[in-house]
Amino acid sequence: MASSSSNRQFSHRNANTFLTYPKCPENPEIACQMIWELVVRWIPKYILCAREAHKDGSLHLHALLQTEKPVRISDSRFFDINGFHPNIQSAKSVNRVRDYILKEPLAVFERGTFIPRKSPFLGKSDSEVKEKKPSKDEIMRDIISHSTSKEEYLSMIQKELPFDWSTKLQYFEYSANKLFPEIQEEFTNPHPPSSPDLLCNESINDWLQPNIFQVSPEAYMLLQPACYTLDDAISDLQWMDSVSSHQMKDQESRASTSSAQQEQENLLGPEA
């Protein structure tokens, strides 16, 4: 089976974007500049990149991007940098995402001015106002629109809905198989396409001789209790081969409709 994929349309639309590049050793400053240039049309205002280390020592990169206009993309490869593909998510709480990125960084780079989320009525930050928690429908809608593979889809559910993931994993696996069906490998004919070679006479004969046409004396003795010696079995088989060969020749000669082959006299028809 090939790696899973889907013809489902990827979609991301948000002014706050959270990117995670797994197993990416890229320098945060270089990554920031490359991502900044990708979103110039949406007027970037702030970007933060941080390099972190996994427990196994491999490096990964987190990035928080804020733009004046919502980034609108339908290409899941839009944010790829130097061959590294990120997980793309909407940053629902920029303050929390920023705190998460800065928890244990090995290297950090920022550009622009961070825009903390404010309450539209009270003008207070996230730390002062309790944010409205997104519903499960909203979370799943965001996961479906942003995931690009079966593994990424299940990983995002495990992160966002850990209890549901642990108790309803079989249902999520079912939906993952529907969203990202396995691509069937194209059949490759092991035989060459040309007619003479396609017959594979050598291979067929190698199978026919021992399985169809050949009867060993030993096998014949097992089927004929009255045959006691190997010589008798060989003699019987030779006799049967001779008789059957003559019978086949006789049948071929009788099957002909040619009067010349049957050596019949051509009689003259009645005179007019």
UniProtKB/Swiss-Prot annotation:
CC terms in the record's Gene Ontology section: host cell cytoplasm; host cell nucleus
Gene Ontology BP terms: DNA replication; symbiont-mediated perturbation of host cell cycle G1/S transition checkpoint
UniProt GO molecular function: DNA binding; endodeoxyribonuclease activity, producing 5'-phosphomonoesters; metal ion binding; nucleotide binding; nucleotidyltransferase activity; structural molecule activity
Signal peptide: none
Region entry Transactivation, spans: 221-230
CRESS-DNA virus Rep endonuclease domain segment(s): 11-114
Keyword Calcium included in the entry's annotation: no
UniProt-annotated stretches for the region Disordered: 245-272
Region (Binding to RBR1): 198-202
Motif (RCR-3): 100-103
Residues where a divalent metal cation binds: 52, 60, 62, 104
Keywords in alphabetical order: Activator, Covalent protein-DNA linkage, DNA replication, DNA-binding, Endonuclease, G1/S host cell cycle checkpoint dysregulation by virus, Host cytoplasm, Host nucleus, Host-virus interaction, Hydrolase, Metal-binding, Modulation of host cell cycle by virus, Nuclease, Nucleotide-binding, Nucleotidyltransferase, Repressor, Transferase
Region (Oligomerization): 175-187
Enzyme Commission number: 3.1.21.-
SUPFAM superfamilies, alphabetized: Origin of replication-binding domain, RBD-like
Subcellular location(s) per record: Host nucleus; Host cytoplasm
Motif RCR-2, chain ranges: 60-62
The protein's required cofactors: Mg(2+); Mn(2+)
Family membership noted in the UniProt record: Belongs to the geminiviridae Rep protein family.
Assembly and binders: Homooligomer. Interacts with host retinoblastoma-related protein 1 (RBR1), and may thereby deregulate the host cell cycle. Part of the C- and V-complexes which are RepA-Rep-DNA complexes involved in the c-sense and v-sense transcription.
Stated role: Implicated in enhancement of V-sense gene expression. Acts a an inhibitor of C-sense gene transcription.
The protein, known as: Replication-associated protein A
Species whose genome carries this gene: Maize streak virus genotype A (isolate Kenya)
